[in-house]
């Protein structure tokens, strides 16, 4: 069967691939979007049951469609988010083909462009957009060996408390996923140990405005790079149960045991860094700094927003902070499960072109790779802090589509003298 030809192949039909399709269509660029599973599959099957979007409905959406929920301040459940993307594909008539996996992309030896092998046949294309995002392969540290009576799963495999065996739970990682899962388990009556590393801890809301609004008006969504020394700092924010500021001191007051970064495992014991107090202090400082900036903004503009003294209240230091736990014998304290909320890595093994660094990360500028014709979409900090959010990837997709359209204008350019000669030939031929 001959290879199918199209201009641009978009790999992945999550939020990035769908946004890419909309902007390519706006430019009239022929394209196909391939998805190995279903549209927005990760939202349906790689998240826990109670997950909601971390931003309110008015914010975490594409500009051209609202969520069906009439409450625009609601945090949308994961299934409704997936349905939103399915509906959006229909709205823009995106050429999505599900159940097709891209196996290999190589540069063509002649004629320019790329040869693409997929489970649904071969393609010849001029441009590739890798819209698979950054959250592909779960990272589980090879720290604790398998053992009878100890269940170990990554956060992407966690669904609900009933899934775990009876007993205490160790959660490693206190970003948004780890913090939300740990709180859910605690509220379900489990004894939870939470390993807390460096983190940002923004207020869920302050003085009547969600933190997404504050990051917008304060210009923080448009930061192009992380601050010095914060490249690997995670963000702890939650929309669960209507949305509430993640406060690790509050967790401890309710019975959760906090520990520092997980470092090693020896003879049945986990060992933790002596950094819990510093990590909590830096998270608190981040929280208060945003409140201070918000207050200054309100005063400068003379806004009539209500005071919010509750957001500045601080829970007392718990015993686990003043007398930190440095080692934990899992059997002794009854830990029967470990949940690794330790992030994800990228897998671009199918993309066999020279545009990756020594660590396998894409070399690109705002999604435009160093390999002509190859583009990336959905990466954290692709162009700004907001790039990982639904609205942010939509704007990044526009930039990438505009770049592809510009390349088209170069390829179709003809000098005026040549164009006039071609017109004359055409007139004679049709004379």
Question: Where do the PLM segments sit?
Answer:
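Redox-cofactor-proximal catalytic regions of oxidoreductases
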Residues: 40-64, 251
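Flavin (primarily FAD) cofactor-binding/catalytic cores of flavoenzymes
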Residues: 2-45, 75-431
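A short small-residue
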Residues: 62-66, 378-380
């Amino acid at each position: 069967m001959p290879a199918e030809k199209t201009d641009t192949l978009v790999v992945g039909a999550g939020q990035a691939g769908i946004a890419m399709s909309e902007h390519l269509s706006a430019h009239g660029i022929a394209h196909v979007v391939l998805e190995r599973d279903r549209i927005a599959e990760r939202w349906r099957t790689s998240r826990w049951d109670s997950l909601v979007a971390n931003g309110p409905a008015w914010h975490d959406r594409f500009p051209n469609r609202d969520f069906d929920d009439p409450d625009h301040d609601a945090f949308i459940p994961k299934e409704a988010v997936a349905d939103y993307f399915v509906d959006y594909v229909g709205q823009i008539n995106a050429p999505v083909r599900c159940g097709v996996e891209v196996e290999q992309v190589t540069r063509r030896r002649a004629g320019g462009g790329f040869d693409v092998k997929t489970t649904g046949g071969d393609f010849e294309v001029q441009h590739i957009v890798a819209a698979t995002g950054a959250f592909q392969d779960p990272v589980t540290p090879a720290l604790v060996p398998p053992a009878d009576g100890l269940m170990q799963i990554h956060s992407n495999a966690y669904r609900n408390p009933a899934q775990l065996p009876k007993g205490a739970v160790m959660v490693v990682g206190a970003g948004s996923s780890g913090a939300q899962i740990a709180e859910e388990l605690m509220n379900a009556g489990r004894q939870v140990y939470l390993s807390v590393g460096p983190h940002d801890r923004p207020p869920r809301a302050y003085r009547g405005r969600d933190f997404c609004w504050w990051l917008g008006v304060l210009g923080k969504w448009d930061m192009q790079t992380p601050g010095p020394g914060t490249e690997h700092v995670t963000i702890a924010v939650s929309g669960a149960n209507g949305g509430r500021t993640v406060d690790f001191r509050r967790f401890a007051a309710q019975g959760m045991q906090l520990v520092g970064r997980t470092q090693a495992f020896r003879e049945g014991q986990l060992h933790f860094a002596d950094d819990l107090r510093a990590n909590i202090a830096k998270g608190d400082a981040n929280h208060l700094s945003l409140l201070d900036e918000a207050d200054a903004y309100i005063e400068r503009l003379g806004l009539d927003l209500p005071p919010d003294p509750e957001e500045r209240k601080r829970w007392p230091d718990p015993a686990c902070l003043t007398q930190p736990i440095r080692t934990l014998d899992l059997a002794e304290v009854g830990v029967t499960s470990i949940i690794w909320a330790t992030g994800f890595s990228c897998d671009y093994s199918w993309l066999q072109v020279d545009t990756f660094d020594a660590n396998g990360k894409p070399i690109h500028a705002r999604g435009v790779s160093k390999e002509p014709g190859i583009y990336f979409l959905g990466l954290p900090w692709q162009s700004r802090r907001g790039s990982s959010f639904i609205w942010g990837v939509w704007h990044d997709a526009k930039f990438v589509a505009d770049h592809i359209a510009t390349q088209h204008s170069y390829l179709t350019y003809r000098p005026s003298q040549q164009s006039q000669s071609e017109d004359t030939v055409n007139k004679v031929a049709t004379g």
